[in-house]
């Protein structure tokens, strides 16, 4: 297939080094941080294609109009019905039951802007679906992107977030001033 070769060339042209391998688990919540630029999504898709990963993520259903819907679906997007009774967390947990192999990609900050807390959805989804969390990253300071460790949540949010914060502490976003603390709201 030619797409992984195109992705490799794009990474090279962008000056990026891809690190880490494929996850060793069949299902996981894959978080990508820090998220400070529109370019993050582009480079995440290039990395996904380069590595041959099937990563899915939610996109609000109003974005699924022709011809954008085809491009979104090809790249792993799942429409999120924001009007549906229940939460997006519930929809994500249900999605894990639909597939034998499933990686749900999320940006835990929930925005490209500075925020004081990460959204807790990734944590609640992983707990509810009983799957681990894979730590994905885009380190603009060192031009490295990839997948870090796989974390099995303990249920102790403080302990789990300390491990996650330790991993991301040396990673710099495209707009470092937009990076906030790595912690969940109470």
Predicted feature locations:
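Active-site-proximal loop/hinge segments within enzyme catalytic domains
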Residues: 178
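Helix-enriched interaction subdomains in cytosolic or periplasmic regions
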Residues: 1-4
